[in-house]
């Protein structure tokens, strides 16, 4: 079948338009960005070439990060480190200049730890968030539970003006038994406690889609492994990194994957492809 020049031009225009609107969003807890860079993070980014990157757990101040190296890859970069050196911190890298960037939740005790950054693109917002871990003891577990409730309140308020959200990051919670290698032995472990899992269910029920589970219901898909006992080589992991998508923009999702072959951290990246 032969197509007219006009038809071919239309197909070309449409394909280019489609390619330009498809975005690949990667979320990655790097467990120290300087250490990840030393393990080849920049070369990996150059090859994978995502449109938006959400980093968590920078463990570095902005002046300690080779920002120009990321900019050389074509990114506008936005960094929100913790005030405490060598701890926490989030970032958002983007090929497209956002309309607006918001740093933190305007709650000092959380913003001090560099937990959240948001970029707005038209009527869609992308958030990089690092939920606290409670594994160090009761005090931090209590802090985590308070944070979770405050974060949900923040999101519910944000949705009144910015209803189309993509919330990427390390949630430090496995949602269901399928998301952890040993749900029985870990039933009393921080990250799989009933109250944490109940919160994540409420979060999703408030109007979000777990993008990975939308496309994949298979077990043994994890995003974090302990450094102990060769856990990663044995795939004894936890799925605690998510890219949550607001229900109104669920139809824009095209694919969501876990990328365990990337080994710059004790986590691996997760990726989401969307039309916007």
Task: Specify the residue positions occupied by each region the protein language model found.
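Active-site-proximal beta-strand elements of phosphoester/diester hydrolases
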Residues: 23-31, 123-135, 168
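Active-site beta-strand/loop signature of hydrolases that rely on acidic residues for catalysis
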Residues: 28-29, 45-63, 126, 155-177, ...
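Active-site beta-strand termini and strand-to-loop segments that position acidic
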Residues: 95, 119-122, 246-247, 272-276
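Structured beta-strand-rich core segments of catalytic domains in phosphoester-bond hydrolases
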Residues: 58-61, 66-134
């Amino acid at each position: 079948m032969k197509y007219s020049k006009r038809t071919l031009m239309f197909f070309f225009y449409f394909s280019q338009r489609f390619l330009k609107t498809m975005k690949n969003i990667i979320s990655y807890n790097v467990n120290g960005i300087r250490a990840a860079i030393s393990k080849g993070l920049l070369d990996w980014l150059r090859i994978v070439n995502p449109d938006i990157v959400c980093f968590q757990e920078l463990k570095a101040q902005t002046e300690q990060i080779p920002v120009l190296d990321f900019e050389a890859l074509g990114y506008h970069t936005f960094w929100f480190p913790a005030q405490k050196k060598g701890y926490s911190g989030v970032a958002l890298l983007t090929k497209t200049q956002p309309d607006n960037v918001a740093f933190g939740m305007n709650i000092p005790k959380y913003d001090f730890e560099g937990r959240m950054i948001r970029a707005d693109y038209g009527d869609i917002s992308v958030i990089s968030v690092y939920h606290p871990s409670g594994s160090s003891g009761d005090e931090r577990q209590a802090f985590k539970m308070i944070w979770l409730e405050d974060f949900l309140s923040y999101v519910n308020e944000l949705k009144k003006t910015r209803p189309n959200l993509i919330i990427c990051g390390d949630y430090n919670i496995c949602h269901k038994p399928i998301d952890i290698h040993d749900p029985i032995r870990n039933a009393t472990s921080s990250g799989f406690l009933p109250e944490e899992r109940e919160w994540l269910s409420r979060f999703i029920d408030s109007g979000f889609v777990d993008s990975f589970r939308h496309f994949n219901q298979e077990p043994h898909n994890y995003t974090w492994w302990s450094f102990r006992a060769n856990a990663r080589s044995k795939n004894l992991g936890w799925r605690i990194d998510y890219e949550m998508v607001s229900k109104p923009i669920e139809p824009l999702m095209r694919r969501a994957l876990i990328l365990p072959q990337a080994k710059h951290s004790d986590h691996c990246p997760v990726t989401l492809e969307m039309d916007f």
